[in-house]
UniProtKB/Swiss-Prot annotation:
One of its GO terms (molecular function) is DNA-binding transcription factor activity, RNA polymerase II-specific. The keyword DNA-binding applies. It is found in: Nucleus. Binds DNA as a homodimer. Residues 296-309, 420-431 have a biased composition (Low complexity). Keywords: Activator, DNA replication, DNA-binding, Nucleus, Transcription, Transcription regulation. Residues 1-194 bind DNA. The 9aaTAD motif is a transactivation domain present in a large number of yeast and animal transcription factors. Recognizes and binds the palindromic sequence 5'-TTGGCNNNNNGCCAA-3' present in viral and cellular promoters and in the origin of replication of adenovirus type 2. These proteins are individually capable of activating transcription and replication. SMART domains: DWA. One of its GO terms (biological process) is positive regulation of DNA-templated transcription. Belongs to the CTF/NF-I family. This is Nuclear factor 1 X-type.
């Protein structure tokens, strides 16, 4: 069973969950439609007919929302690997509207140019990363050969490697403008008000001759209204609107989706058994060497640990296991770190995800998004770096170890507390 955002244990990552609501559902249909057309041509050595292409389009548009979201989450994982680590957080913040757009650089290929990626399983075509960005986040129907039609904004400082979708535009020629009028006017029933020649002045040609615009032949199976409507629909809203994202606004971070609204049970304060921090994701598919893992927003942590296979492989949804790196002595640790403000983790506010623009409405099932083993450590906007989690690990496991080893330590007297702490000190009441 898929979660509303299709973030299974192997696919969950803050980067993916933050960007998924901003992916256009049109991108799934477009990438798959292009692949079907290429496959058909290789097999039959002829192009699809309009009827066949329209049938494939309708089939893809009617695909289950979980399938589209699962595809989008895997593609976002690939995008993350091909973006420079120092640009990933800026990319998320700019796409979610928390920060002004800035350059987001692609990892260069062997020639120093923008990388190309495959967007489907067993794909026979690779797409330039900037093309993928524009299709994913703007819903522009570009082909894989349209790279030279892209133009970078004047404020873009690195046009050779920048893949920021807000820095990328599409060049329009005079022919495009001319055709746009004749294609849009019959579809909408209205013409440009600036046109000095009204509809009454356009007279039909005699002797059955067709006007020039009547000879236009579209190569695709989309009309203007349908294309615009589908390209503006987020992939996360395919299950049907029921409430507005405007009700979910909350400050901080680059999330803005309440765990309660998503069907996830609220994270309560630490219990007597103590919180357990799940092992971080195996970064085989989501992490590169030396990458930072961002848990932005008040108290966001990764899902329970699991092994990440190849991006095109099947998803393993087996229950996660928690591991402890070692034993911690409760009393001796208190003497060294009790004065740290991080120790009073029970007083932090409950985790709330923050940051998706209220552009559309979402409706999700009420089931739990991810299996929860216990409340997470809550602290606003923390960056966890590899090899620097000693104090955090102590905070996560000190209560659990203290409670579990309490009966064993009852046979020997505990060492006296430091002078800075006493039984009446309210700071020690947390433990």
């Amino acid at each position: 069973m898929y979660s509303p955002y299709c973030l299974t244990q192997d696919e969950f990552h803050p980067f993916i969950e933050a960007l998924l609501p901003h992916v256009r559902a049109f991108s799934y249909t477009w990438f798959n439609l292009q692949a079907r057309k290429r496959k058909y041509f290789k097999k039959h050595e002829k192009r699809m007919s309009k009827e066949e292409e329209r049938a494939v389009k309708d089939e893809l548009l009617g695909e289950k929302p979980e399938v589209k979201q699962k595809w989008a989450s895997r593609l976002l994982a690939k995008l993350r690997k091909d973006i420079r680590p120092e640009c990933r957080e800026d990319f998320v913040l700019s796409v979610t509207g928390k920060k002004a757009p800035c350059c987001v650089l692609s990892n260069p290929d062997q020639k120093g140019k923008i990388r190309r990626i495959d967007c489907l399983r067993q794909a026979d075509k690779v797409w330039r990363l900037d093309l993928v960005m524009v299709i994913l986040f703007k819903g522009v129907p570009l082909e894989s050969t349209d790279g030279e039609r892209l133009a970078k904004a004047p404020q873009c400082a690195s046009p050779g490697l920048c893949v920021q979708p807000h820095h990328i535009g599409v060049t329009i020629k005079e022919l495009d403008l001319y055709l746009a009028f004749f294609v849009q006017a019959p579809d909408s029933g209205q013409s440009d008000s600036s046109n000095p020649q009204g509809d009454a002045d356009i007279k039909p040609l005699p002797n059955g001759h067709l006007s020039f615009q009547d000879c236009f032949v579209t190569s695709g199976v989309w009309n203007v209204t349908e294309l615009v409507r589908v390209s503006q629909t987020p992939v996360a809203t395919a299950s049907g609107p029921n409430f507005s994202l405007a009700d979910l606004e909350s400050p901080g971070g680059y999330y803005n989706i309440s765990p309660v609204t998503l069907g996830r049970r609220p994270l309560g304060p630490p219990t007597a058994s103590g919180p357990k921090r799940p092992k971080a994701l195996d970064e085989g598919d989501l992490e590169g060497p030396g990458d930072d893992v961002f848990y932005s927003g008040p108290g966001r942590s990764p899902a329970p640990g699991s092994s990440q296979g190849p991006w095109g492989g099947d998803v393993d949804t087996s229950p996660a296991t928690l591991k402890k790196s070692g034993k911690l002595d409760f009393c001796s640790a208190l003497s060294g770190h009790a004065a740290s403000p991080r120790m009073a983790f029970g007083h932090h506010p409950l985790p709330v995800l923050a940051g998706v623009r209220p552009a559309s409405a979402l409706h999700f099932p009420s089931g739990s998004l991810l299996p929860q083993s216990g409340p997470y450590f809550a602290h606003p906007t923390i960056r966890y770096h590899h090899g620097q989690d000693s104090l955090k690990d102590f905070v996560q496991f000190v209560c659990a170890d203290g409670a579990a080893q309490g009966p064993q330590h009852s046979q020997r007297p505990a060492p006296p507390l430091p002078p800075a702490l006493s039984a009446s000190d309210p700071a020690t009441a947390t433990f």
